[in-house]
Design a protein with these regions (language model features):
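Conserved PLP-anchoring active-site segment centered on the Schiff-base-forming lysine
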Residues: 77-127, 132, 298
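Short, proline-centered helix/strand-breaking motifs
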Residues: 92, 154, 338-340
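Residue-level detector of anion-binding/catalytic polar loops
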Residues: 109, 154, 303-304
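Active-site phosphate-binding strand-loop segment of PLP-dependent enzymes
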Residues: 117-191, 197-199
Length: 357
């Protein structure tokens, strides 16, 4: 009988290593959440107010309104600006479709606009008929916010992937009439469930957002001012975000080190903007003309490697666009994402670097 060769399991380096994060801070999250649960606060307890205050203060905003998820934050922000139904709202063609769906759900028309080399919306390509803009700061990169501001229409910044990004001394979420955050499990600070937030400097818009978040009702009122959502984070989710924020600076430092090392050791161009004051590096993206071959090579090496986003907004059957979208289509076809979480070991980083050479 022939001798059987031993079977070895390939090393698997996951894109998101939330299991390691939980091992590191899970007990701390649970302890903080339990302190609220013991007082009977499943939602909307003192911890929620603490989170909103911390986010507003840290990101240089006057108001922060937490929501059930990042998509709800976009929904609420778009409804808060009270545009006439059917208004044209411009959004980056290169983004996760939630950014466009929120526009459609609010009863408006989605106008997909091409991106520039940063993967963010090209301000020069925004039609003059646009009543507002949803500017997605993708992969931790940042839009040309000064140019967007000069358009003279409401700007909503989707900062779901750029929580810690800074350019010219301002956080991504400091820009726009309103800005939106997400704390889903794929984000750099996770709620271990769902969660999001809307930030603004306007007292009126903040009040609108709080009303829209809770069935259209003002706090301590039984009367609805209009239709609204039921969009709140649980005490556990709030505890997870607060705990994550405490460690976020050192996590960011590690992600930045990894990003710089992989960029310097790669034969492929890196799509992340290293010229910012600070990049979140929420996703580390490289470019290759033989992208599909590279992705296959990574998988053969036991390394997670994915494409964000294979389906662009204008590719969705429910949306159409008359604009030129050649840059976003080109970038979509050459881009791939590699692991970059702060939990990677030095050995794993070296393995990824070898796959990039």
């Amino acid at each position: 009988m022939p001798k059987l060769l031993p079977l070895f399991k390939k090393m698997s380096i996951k894109l998101f290593q939330n299991d390691r994060i939980w091992t590191s801070i899970g007990n701390e999250i649970t302890e903080l959440a339990n302190s609220m649960h013991a007082q009977g606060y499943a939602q909307n307890g003192p911890l929620t107010e603490t989170l909103e205050q911390q986010l507003a203060q840290h990101l240089g905003r006057k108001h922060c309104i937490t929501t059930g998820c990042g998509t709800d934050a976009l929904d609420i922000a778009i409804q808060a600006i009270e545009l006439p139904r059917g208004s044209n709202i411009a959004v980056s063609n290169y983004t996760f479709t939630a950014s466009a769906h929120a526009i459609k759900r609010a009863g408006h028309e989605v106008v997909a606009v091409d991106v520039d080399s940063t993967y963010c919306i090209d301000a020069a390509g925004i039609p003059k008929s646009s009543a507002a803009v949803v500017a997605v700061d993708l992969f931790g990169n940042m839009s040309s916010h000064q140019k967007l501001q000069e358009l003279g229409v409401p700007i909503i910044v989707d900062a779901a992937q750029s929580l810690e990004s800074i350019a010219q001394g301002k956080y991504s979420a400091q820009h726009g009439m309103l800005s939106c955050l997400s704390f889903s499990p794929s984000k750099t600070v996770s709620s271990w469930g769902s969660g999001g937030a809307v930030l603004t400097d306007s007292d009126y818009l903040a009040n609108r957002c709080r009303t829209l978040r809770l069935h259209g009702k003002l706090k301590n009122s039984q009367m609805s001012m209009g239709p609204g959502l039921n969009s709140m984070m649980s005490s556990f989710e709030v505890a997870a975000v607060l705990t994550g924020l405490k460690y976020a600076p050192q996590w960011l430092q590690r992600r930045t080190q990894i990003a710089q090392y992989l960029r310097d050791h790669s034969r492929h161009a890196c799509a992340n903007d290293f010229g910012l004051d600070q990049n979140t590096f929420s996703k580390l993206v490289f470019q290759a003309k033989d992208r599909d071959h590279v992705v296959k090579h990574f998988k053969n090496c036991g390394i997670d490697c994915v494409v964000h986003y294979n389906l662009l907004v204008a590719d969705e059957t429910i949306y159409t666009s008359n604009n030129s979208l050649t840059n976003s289509q080109y970038l979509r076809d050459i881009s791939f994402t590699v692991p970059n979480q702060h939990t990677l070991t030095d050995s794993e980083v070296e393995t990824i670097a070898k796959a990039l050479t």
